[in-house]
């Protein structure tokens, strides 16, 4: 019988085997300075591509003042605990209401981070009889969400509408055979790894031929 801990010591995995060169460089890098499009890395100013500060609001004076005021009033530990149990607050619900109003939606829900949001959405929407059809270059958060899926999934070639239609035909055939379930198509507005745009109009046009819901990351 193999010792699973012993295996971890002997096999560091595809990234771990480069740990001596990777650590502090392309794994766990240390950036210095204020949050921005340019920060210092190992003493040199670099362009930063991987921050979630998309709108550049992190250092806006009004945002920083709100951060400071909230820290003074509530401290850094409030709320504490899982939100469903003891971590909910009026501030959460107020922000959700404001976001929903801004987007002209009925309601909104906050997640800790976008990765969790997509994973949770797939899990919440799809059941074991449902089928997901998704682009081959979807982000890792979508792939991880699909790993939790009890139902079937079909992948189509990146931005290939003809192949997407083929996979929809397979999905529809499976739904017809099961006599239950629905179809969810997943793609992205802008593919984060390559930077190209998803063919949203073309995918949406397939709704003229097939019955499915569309999830765009």
What is the role of each PLM region?
Residues 10-78, 212:
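N-terminal "arm"/small-domain region of PLP-dependent enzymes with the aminotransferase-like
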Residues 65-113:
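Conserved N-terminal alpha-helix of the aminotransferase class I/II PLP-enzyme fold
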Residues 56-57, 84-88, 140, 161-162, ...:
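Short, small-residue-enriched loops and turns at beta-alpha junctions
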Residues 128, 148-150, 210:
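Short, structured coil segments at secondary-structure junctions
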Residues 110, 115-121, 141-142, 193:
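Short glycine/serine/threonine-rich phosphate/pyrophosphate-binding segments
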Residues 154, 159-215:
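Active-site phosphate-binding strand-loop segment of PLP-dependent enzymes
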Residues 122-140:
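Conserved PLP-anchoring active-site segment centered on the Schiff-base-forming lysine
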